[in-house]
Amino acid sequence: MFQDEARFGRMVRIRRCWAPWPARPMVGNGYEREFLYVYGAVSPLQGQFDWMITHIMNTTHMSEFLAQVSSAHRRDFIVMVVDGASSHKAHDLVVPENMRLLRLPPYSPELNPQEHVWDE
């Protein structure tokens, strides 16, 4: 399986608002940011896709995602291909017994089919 994560969100700049005439409200000039992070793993040969949505991307959530994939494929031994993200190399990353991580060389997203899932 090939694993990757992505960030989806919105950045809104608040500049105007509606108010009844003749009121003239003061609108602060600020940004609103909201993001969601998605961990995904795809198996192109089997046509399977596993995913998990979180509000933060860190080693703890990566460990949870690996456990989720492991439990979904209990009877299989999984070779999970990952990129060089820091959460994939952390010492406190928990890798399930039926899974091994295979790291891609640096700067090689073209070797990871999961990268193209986010393009859709």
Put a short name on every predicted segment.
Residues 1-120:
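Short functional hotspots at interaction and active-site rims
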